[in-house]
Design a protein with these regions (language model features):
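A broadly conserved sequence feature marking short terminus-proximal activation segments
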Residues: 5, 12, 25-29, 41-64, ...
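Acidic, turn-prone loop/beta-hairpin segments
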Residues: 83, 93, 237-264, 295-397, ...
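Short metal-binding segments enriched for Cys and/or His
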Residues: 114, 189, 490-496
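Short Cys/His-rich "knuckle" micro-motifs
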Residues: 52-54, 95-98, 477-481, 492-495
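Short Cys/His-rich zinc-binding micro-motifs
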Residues: 465-477
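Structured, non-catalytic alpha/beta "coupling" segments that mediate domain-domain communication
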Residues: 213-239, 331-349, 416-450
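Cysteine-rich micro-motifs
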Residues: 85, 478-488
Length: 498
């Protein structure tokens, strides 16, 4: 038992106590169907005849004629002459009429299945069944394997609870609370059903209802929209466009560091069969990265020059996110991820690319471009904690200003952030332009105040005029555009003239 990994961990004590307290196992049953017990009785004295020679003869009989031959073929027709009663020496034998307990049949699958197929191996990597099988298949397999070979037939055993309705009641046709998975697939789609399965803690009974599937459908929609955001913003991106670590912007490095930390966390969760933890980590990441990063880099993605380092830097991160997300969520959202895999930007489809995401392999650190040293990733994640704290203060101030009717878009705002010297210095180290991008405002000012408890933010109307192209408030040139947009549009005009 100590050499087997039991999932959940408490199952180890459960199976241990059950085996310790169980009575002797009577493996014979009196039925007209089942697997025969391959032993013989002496017709003269009733002694049991069972030895290596008789077993080999029965094995060969079953191999050539099937198990029914036990009832249709006389023992003397297939037993060697050397097989006789060890008590009286008689050769007049009859086959046992009792059959094996069905738990013995399934319990020896480690030999009848794993031991006879060259593409399988024993012990099995995993046995998987409901929690009731601690008394059934898990236990019968353990007993027969230890008895025959001295060890367990499995490396790990995973047991799951049962589905109940939203009130915790067992599903029953008489109650009318049974939910047909086919109907769920027809109404919500197969991946919503799969997402529900992947999102629940299977170690205990799992509640299921229409309301739960509706909430799961909402979560699925958010994931699907994230895929759409990534695909649409990578339409013109190719693998040759990945920027180097030296070129990548700091804010993008932070997002990439978060992604790599997530992949490490979820990989461990999948390895430990904690699928609901892997899903929860991905979902929480999607929710937070959407507001903290996706919204912030839209300005670069939509308004910067198409092939600028700044835009390619953000796209490099989005490409890494797409690759990691589609590969890691494929075991749960099989159909959606295959659809995404087929819609990958043409420039990201390398020659020899596998046809299905299931064949693409699991993402690891080598799959990310650029490669960031672990020490740099940790430093970025730590240093950006203060940035996100300041962001929360700015977002709160913007929301209050919106409620007061001062403005509707955050780009209309200039943010002033106050904090003590240490906080302001740490925040200012990231650069005012970077902070303005993260906070999605047109201007940022920092002020030291020893009286401030944490960060205190206020917003006011940003100076300048609204650029009609990027919507940021800047000093506009003769063409009515900000300096950045003027340069981008001028480049377009030059290309058109050529």
């Amino acid at each position: 038992n100590d050499n087997v990994r039991w999932i959940p961990a408490w199952a180890s004590n459960r199976i241990g106590s059950m085996v310790e307290e169980r009575p002797d196992w009577c493996i014979s049953r009196q039925r007209f169907w089942g697997v025969p017990i391959p032993v013989f009785k002496c017709k003269s004295c009733g002694e049991i005849v069972a030895n290596e020679e008789s077993f080999d003869a029965v094995i060969e009989l079953f191999r050539t004629k099937g198990a029914d031959a036990w009832y249709t073929t006389a023992p003397e027709d297939y037993l060697p002459s050397s097989v006789c009663c060890p008590n009286c020496g008689s050769h007049e034998l009859e086959g046992e009429k009792d059959v094996l307990d069905v738990w013995w049949e399934s319990g020896v699958s480690h030999t009848s299945v794993l031991g006879t197929r060259p593409y399988l191996h024993r012990p099995a990597d995993l046995y998987l069944e409901g929690s009731d099988q601690h008394r059934g298949w898990f236990q019968s397999s353990l007993l027969t394997s230890v008895g025959a070979y001295g060890d367990a037939p499995y490396k790990a055993v995973l047991s799951c609870g049962f589905t109940v309705d939203e009130n915790g009641r067992k599903m029953s046709k008489s109650i009318g609370n049974v939910i047909d998975p086919i109907e769920v697939c027809d109404e919500f789609g197969a991946d919503v059903l799969r997402l529900w399965v992947g999102s629940v803690d299977y170690s205990q009974d799992m509640s299921v209802s229409r309301n739960i599937f509706e909430r799961t459908s909402d979560a699925y929609r958010r994931i699907r929209n994230t895929f759409r955001y990534l695909l649409s913003n990578l339409n013109d991106f190719a693998n040759a466009d990945f920027v180097s670590a030296d070129e990548m912007l700091e804010f993008d490095k932070w997002a990439l560091s978060r992604l790599q930390a997530l992949v490490a966390e979820t990989t461990q969760a999948f390895d430990e069969y904690r699928f609901h933890n892997a899903y929860r980590a991905w979902y929480d990441f999607i929710v937070s990265i959407s507001s903290e990063y996706f919204d912030a880099v839209k300005d670069r993605l939509y308004a910067d020059a198409a092939d600028s380092v700044e835009r390619r830097s953000a796209q490099s991160v989005l490409a890494d996110m797409l690759e990691a997300m589609v590969r890691q969520l494929a075991p749960i959202l099989a159909f959606t991820c295959d659809e995404v895999w087929e819609k990958f930007p043409e420039g990201m489809m390398e020659e020899g690319r596998v046809a299905a995401v299931a064949l693409a392999g699991w993402p690891d650190e080598e799959d990310f471009a650029p490669q960031l040293p672990a020490s740099e990733r940790e430093e970025l994640l730590t240093s950006y904690e203060v940035v996100m704290e300041a962001r929360d203060a700015v977002m709160k101030a913007i929301e209050e200003a919106r409620n007061d009717g001062l403005f509707t878009k955050s780009q209309e705002a200039a943010a002033t952030i106050m904090g003590n010297t240490e906080l302001i210095e740490a925040l200012g180290a990231h650069g005012l332009d970077t902070l303005a991008e993260i906070f999605i405002v047109s201007n940022v000012e920092l002020e030291e105040s020893d009286d401030a408890d944490g960060f205190v933010a206020s917003v006011s109307q940003a100076p300048g005029e609204k650029c009609p192209r990027c919507w940021n408030y800047r000093e506009l040139g003769p063409d009515g555009l900000c300096e950045r947009c003027h340069e981008v549009v001028a480049a377009f005009d030059m290309q058109a003239d050529e």
